[in-house]
Amino acid sequence: MTNIIELPEVLANQIAAGEVVERPASVVKELVENAIDAKSSQITVEIEESGLKMIQVTDNGEGMSHEDLPLSLRRHATSKIKSQSDLFRIRTLGFRGEALPSVASISKITIKTATKEVTHGSLLIATGGEIETLEAISTPTGTKIKVENLFYNTPARLKYMKSLQAELAHIVDVVNRLSLAHPEVAFTLISDGRQLTQTSGTGDLRQAIAGIYGLNTTKKMLAISNADLDFEVSGYVSLPELTRANRNYMTILVNGRYIKNFLLNRAILDGYGSKLMVGRFPIVVIDIQIDPYLADVNVHPTKQEVRISKERELMALISTAISESLKEQDLIPDALENLAKSSTRHFSKPEQTQLPLQSRGLYYDPQKNDFFVKESAVSEKIPETDFYSGAVDNSVKVEKVELLPHSEEVIGPSSVKHASRPQNTFTETDHPNLDLKNRQKLSQMLTRLENEGQSVFPELDYFGQMHGTYLFAQGKDGLFIIDQHAAQERVKYEYYRDKIGEVDSSLQQLLVPYLFEFSGSDFINLQEKMALLNEVGIFLEVYGHNTFILREHPIWMKEEEIASGVYEMCDMLLLTNEVSIKTYRAELAIMMSCKRSIKANHSLDDYSARNLLLQLAQCQNPYNCPHGRPVLINFSKADMEKMFRRIQENHTSLRELGKY
């Protein structure tokens, strides 16, 4: 008796379904790709309960004949390829003949189809891969496939499913990618009777992008184009100012097929160069037309992994196309728009009134074009400069660079009349104007400063500057070279981090609400996770298609950072499934410290340079900037003697060798 048997076809299809049909979105992908291959110009996707109860795809394509219909449920039966040579010039999205049999084996499937050559169509009903009904019916040209009770006979896969909202988000993402890949097809996605996505099918990629990401996003996207003998690259990329926190908005299409490719993603980022902020990614839709002989799509059942010949040449084409397109643009953002962070609103915004709520945090002074920290009563009595570097001597006539905010700036522009306030530095925390809470904060600050004073950071004696970029100082361990930008970036980062670390849970009403647009999948995911945003004081309400409205904002989020701040918090939530004010404010501190620090080629007077080194010595970590770059390097006396060959590697003196 033999131990090896040939598996029944239904069982083999169920095994194949484990690879092909991972979730309801996989079914939508396979059925829609079949509809596209059938030369459809209109495709409607209807789902119930995120596809677990029902998925229905209707198209106006070529349809199937009565004879071909039962063959479509046979494994490896396909009309896409006929011979081995066809495998190397595939231009259709499907070709394996696995998708439909796999789907049918784990669901109840109903197919209605008709071709334009016949007067009647056909109906097929199958459950678990077994055909129950096959008969002639009257139906329009095209195909309608309904999949019901998905995974009913594979409970392990059904148990693996995430929430309905998460599965719906995957379906929306699949339809969006296919819409971008085929703008000539009009797509409609309906979930539980509600329309989520609709594209016009005009063939205009830019119009398809507007239908998915919104008109405001599309306005900030640039067309790119490049070609050689093997590849044609075209598409749209966002301006450097329009970015997201993850790569999910980067869409790469090869011959109308959405693919994932790490090297091509890197080529896109290389095209932007240093124009992108660290950790930010552009919105990109790139269409690559390639000879099928140079692309092997027969790698994985999902066909999202494609091996491309001459990949390095293609990477260079993409990078060049993006960089050349950006060169032709004025990348300086609109000053008022950048200041107000109000790119998502379609109307002029009157000045917001401030509620009489006491808070501390970062504010922006448009007259001084600088940020300042608005303090409570503590700061009005004890200036911050007393704690960090002592009072600043403004009598120096040469150009000076502000290392930390002056005491006048600390209390804000509305309090400039308080310039005569006491400048005394109290050595004790028992001050009559300090309440218990502020005494504790001040005590903690003094304790921290005392500990910082005991740091092992070397005592440095400044003596010069090179190229307006590097400071030179000497200490007992030799020569120290300090990057002045990195040094002040560290100083300002720790300053801002402390000042914005605490937040107020109060809310302030907005006179004019903000509108926030998201892609369909992000919109659905955010609805599911809205409770987490509510916990940090962000209350978004659904307002139209893929749009939220914000009617009030948390006090810890200042007026000028509402638009960017809400988007940042939403991106953080989508990326990490959690939202943290602390993380957001830390990132804000890094950004502000970089923008407000001394730049290269900026000469410092001796006083400012020495003051910067004093403040650097008081930092918790004076050795690296917030981005991780070194702040200073050291040449010991022995290193210098080696470089000038005053000593040999074996430490034998040149004098001892009789050469000095």
UniProtKB/Swiss-Prot annotation:
Pfam families: DNA_mis_repair (PF01119), HATPase_c_3 (PF13589), MutL_C (PF08676). One of its GO terms (cellular component) is mismatch repair complex. The keyword DNA damage applies. One of its GO terms (biological process) is mismatch repair. The keyword Membrane does not apply. Keywords: DNA damage, DNA repair. One of its GO terms (molecular function) is ATP-dependent DNA damage sensor activity. CDD domains: HATPase_MutL-MLH-PMS-like, MutL_Trans. Belongs to the DNA mismatch repair MutL/HexB family. This protein is involved in the repair of mismatches in DNA. It is required for dam-dependent methyl-directed DNA mismatch repair. May act as a 'molecular matchmaker', a protein that promotes the formation of a stable complex between two or more DNA-binding proteins in an ATP-dependent manner without itself being part of a final effector complex. NCBIfam families: mutl, PRK00095.1-3. This is DNA mismatch repair protein MutL.
